[in-house]
């Protein structure tokens, strides 16, 4: 279902989250063309390193202002750095300290973009907010569903799975019905300053710097041994927090005698002994899981799923939908997959779908081996 037609938009005031990127720029433009009263809001979510080569906030604000000036709308600014630190960044650090690999973008959406920003926009008198996310919404039977974006290469429902239906109901997603090339074409046609601006990648507060350089500013590293699955010590790591399951690059253990030429991969992060367990080969059996246990489940809508139930799931962004059976456990949920899943990583999110509907998801706690003979210590 497309967002309301012009006849439904009379006098509705929408505040668009302007990131300084092309997607939010085109979102604001499209809403104006649909007859909404549109204003923009630029969020500042990070205070550290302002003015350095890593922080693009000033450039992004300038781009957002240029677009707003071009299309003739007001741009508000708001500082949510304190909320971001308390609700996103401290959790990010705690997860890494615990040896897990978190996804701060998911928390940022739930706590900042669809909570702090939404509340602030309502305080400014908005009827609705809008963002440049590649997702869609559908109102049905008194609830609002979150749907995948039409562009399978840009669909961002994975990152919005923890946002509630009540928040989705107050949000418009103008580019969710479009593919990325169409969005850029619209921006170029209207000569928007962001038309050719590259998409942002990675974690926003880290920017282009090395991840390890950033993390060691906040957490003390604990070096330890790198071992094979047979227990042989073949190197040392600088800290388990710098590594993730399935990682190949940056291990520094090449050229070992009688080891063969296959690359090494991270298989296990042994927190108890502060050891990194590695093995050779992209298809090493310890990399594959049959099932996972998840906690901290957020459903977009609190509906009865009549578990166990056949669904599809993603254990990482841009993964194709993986058929699975979801069931309730004592402490959370268990998803059992039809096919082996590679590098299922504790701390990351598993997101569940029923066709094009994003139902919700949770945090991966445990990855179970594909077969008993592949059981890990």
Swiss-Prot record:
Belongs to the MnmA/TRMU family. It is an enzyme of class 2 (transferase). The record marks 133, 348 as: Interaction with tRNA. Its EC number is 2.8.1.13. This is tRNA-specific 2-thiouridylase MnmA. One of its GO terms (molecular function) is tRNA binding. It catalyses: S-sulfanyl-L-cysteinyl-[protein] + uridine(34) in tRNA + AH2 + ATP = 2-thiouridine(34) in tRNA + L-cysteinyl-[protein] + A + AMP + diphosphate + H(+). Disulfide bonds join 108-204. The gene is mnmA. Pfam families: tRNA_Me_trans, tRNA_Me_trans_C, tRNA_Me_trans_M. GO terms for cellular component: cytoplasm. InterPro entries: MnmA-like, MnmA-like_C, MnmA-like_central, MnmA-like_central_sf, Rossmann-like_a/b/a_fold. Catalyzes the 2-thiolation of uridine at the wobble position (U34) of tRNA, leading to the formation of s(2)U34. Residues 103-105 are annotated as: Interaction with target base in tRNA. The active site is at 108 (nucleophile), 204 (cysteine persulfide intermediate).
């Amino acid at each position: 279902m497309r967002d309301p037609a012009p006849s439904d938009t009379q006098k509705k005031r929408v505040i668009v989250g302007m990131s300084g990127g092309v997607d939010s720029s085109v979102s604001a433009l499209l809403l104006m063309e649909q007859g909404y009263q549109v204003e923009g809001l630029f969020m500042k979510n990070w205070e550290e390193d302002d003015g350095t080569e890593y922080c693009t906030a000033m450039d992004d604000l300038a781009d957002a202002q240029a677009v707003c000036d071009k299309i003739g709308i007001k741009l508000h600014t708001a500082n949510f750095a304190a909320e971001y630190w308390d609700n996103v960044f401290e959790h990010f650090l705690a997860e890494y300290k615990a040896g897990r690999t978190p996804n701060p973008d998911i928390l940022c959406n739930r706590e900042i973009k669809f909570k702090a920003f939404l509340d602030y926009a309502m305080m400014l008198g908005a009827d609705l907010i809008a963002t440049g996310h590649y997702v869609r919404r559908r109102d049905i039977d008194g609830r609002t569903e979150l749907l995948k974006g039409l562009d399978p290469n840009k669909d961002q429902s994975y990152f919005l799975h923890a946002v509630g239906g009540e928040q989705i109901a107050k949000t418009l997603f103008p580019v969710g019905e479009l593919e990325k090339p169409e969005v850029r074409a619209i921006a170029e046609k209207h000569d928007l300053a962001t038309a050719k601006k590259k998409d942002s990648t990675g974690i926003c507060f880290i920017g282009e710097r090395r991840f390890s350089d950033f993390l060691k500013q906040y957490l003390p590293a604990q070096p330890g041994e790198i071992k094979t699955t047979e227990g042989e010590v073949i190197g040392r790591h600088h800290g388990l927090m710098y590594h993730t399951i399935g990682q190949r690059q940056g291990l520094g253990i090449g050229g070992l005698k009688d080891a063969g030429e296959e690359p090494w991969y991270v298989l296990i992060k042994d927190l108890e002994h502060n050891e990194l367990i590695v093995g050779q080969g992209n298809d090493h059996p310890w990399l594959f899981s049959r099932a996972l246990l998840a906690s901290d489940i957020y459903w977009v809508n609190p509906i009865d799923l009549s578990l166990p139930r056949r669904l599809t799931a993603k254990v990482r962004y841009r993964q194709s939908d993986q058929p699975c059976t979801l069931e309730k456990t004592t402490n959370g949920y268990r998803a059992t997959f039809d096919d082996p899943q590679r590098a299922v990583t504790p701390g990351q999110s598993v997101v569940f779908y029923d066709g094009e509907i994003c139902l919700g998801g949770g945090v991966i706690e445990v990855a179970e081996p594909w077969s008993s003979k592949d059981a890990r210590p």
